[in-house]
């Protein structure tokens, strides 16, 4: 699992389908 910070860019990069 990836331990990335809770940033808006990270969420969009990890789950772009959510924004689609």
From Swiss-Prot:
Main location: periplasm
Enzyme Commission code(s) on record: 1.15.1.1
InterPro entries reported for this sequence: Mn/Fe_SOD_N (IPR019831), Mn/Fe_SOD_N_sf (IPR036324)
UniProt keyword annotation of Oxidoreductase present: yes
Cellular compartments annotated: Periplasm
Database matches in SUPFAM superfamilies: Fe,Mn superoxide dismutase (SOD), N-terminal domain
Reaction(s) this enzyme catalyzes, per UniProt: 2 superoxide + 2 H(+) = H2O2 + O2
Self-association and partners: Homodimer.
Annotated function: Destroys superoxide anion radicals which are normally produced within the cells and which are toxic to biological systems.
Protein name (record): Superoxide dismutase [Fe]
